[in-house]
Amino acid sequence: LERDDERWRELYPHATAEDEARIARMLSSWAGSQLAERVRGLQGVTVELPFAFAVDDVLIRGRFDLYHRGADGSALVVDYKTNVLGDRTPDELVERSYGHQVAIYALAALLGGATSVDITYAFLDRPDAVVVRSFTSGDLDSLRDGVRASMAPILEGRFLPRPGPWCNECPALDLLCAGPALPS
């Protein structure tokens, strides 16, 4: 894996040597993983594939990190995660933090014509510990219902920003949200 150091510094001016070493480790681990080997053998893989669909009157847009549709209509979606897992398992993290994303990705693939889809999370911290959630066109109604339920509080105006450590670096702090001034 090679990179243009000048371009790297331009894109990531605050990256430390530790950041660079972590990224290099993750890329190297991914390149040697079973999933990467599988993907290398597929024809017609698309990266950063945009999608858009509506649930009721709400437009949902996103991008698949990696998408492949087989001749049989089955789809593979791979989402790369750079989370530091620590003691957590990838499965625990997907259950706790990515349930809405799973449903949205599955809906996007199925509404886009796939007959079935494997939503696959590749945690680059442990690239061979993938998490796969599988769906078929028979799951469309339950997936839509789940996305509707997720959107309901937002559509009803019942949501607050969640302050976190990223707020300290936000250029829009106190302009778009109250950030750390909100009660926890």
Where are these regions (language model features)?
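Generic, well-ordered alpha-helical scaffold segments in large soluble proteins
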Residues: 11, 26-33, 108, 112, ...
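Polybasic (Lys/Arg-rich)
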Residues: 124, 137-172
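A non-catalytic, helix-rich entry segment at domain boundaries
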Residues: 1-50, 54
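Short beta-strand or tight-loop elements
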Residues: 43-49, 60-64, 163
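Surface-exposed helix-capping loop/turn segments at secondary-structure junctions
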Residues: 1-4, 14-15, 37-38, 111-117, ...
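Mg2+/Mn2+-dependent nuclease catalytic core
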Residues: 56-145
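Acidic, low-complexity intrinsically disordered tails
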Residues: 183-184
